[in-house]
Amino acid sequence: ADGDRRQPQARAVVSAGVAAVARAGLAACGASLPLVLAAVLLAGCGSTSKRGAYYQGDGPPDRIPADLAEAPDAVPRVEPLHPRANRPYTALGRSYTPLTADAPFRQKGAASWYGRQFHGNRTASGEIYDMFAMTAAHPTLPIPSYARVTNLRNGRSVIVRVNDRGPFKDGRIIDLSYGAAVRLGVAAAGTGEVEVERLTN
């Protein structure tokens, strides 16, 4: 739900680095380009103005399921790591090394969310983004993996499946699906302070 959100991949990951950079910079421009070209043109797309808590073209769906606030958590299970989405990559000049060891992980910071502009497009895992599913994007948690996200203001929590990369804006630590943001009570504000706890890879 913010302008660092990325151009969705047109196909399975060409490389984690190129995909992350392309998605990070071109979403607000409405571009639909091959990933390599998108990365080259990234520098020209940084001036889109905000409208509310998200950038022009993104936001909540026109129709919200009546029971979305009661949607069930993602169910953690052990899955093989994606062969390409867990490689080191660079996005917006910063290098990231995804975590691949099965080790505890906790992090506090701001959560944002992404919505209708990306609904139906591919994530870094190659899966189709469903804005109503309990999923999330994280810069370094394994893809796929599961995490409990807790709203530090109201105590609500949700279990999400990490299947995408981002956010790449300072202070943001996780990009939630719209459904997960509704569950946590941060959809209206656009962001909220949360704690992320890894559950399993």
For each predicted feature, which ranges?
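Sec-dependent bacterial lipoprotein signal peptides
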Residues: 14-43
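Intrinsic-disorder-associated, low-complexity terminal segments enriched in Asp/Asn/His/Tyr and depleted
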Residues: 2-4
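Low-complexity, intrinsically disordered or signal/transmembrane-proximal segments
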Residues: 7-9
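Secreted/periplasmic proteins
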Residues: 45-201
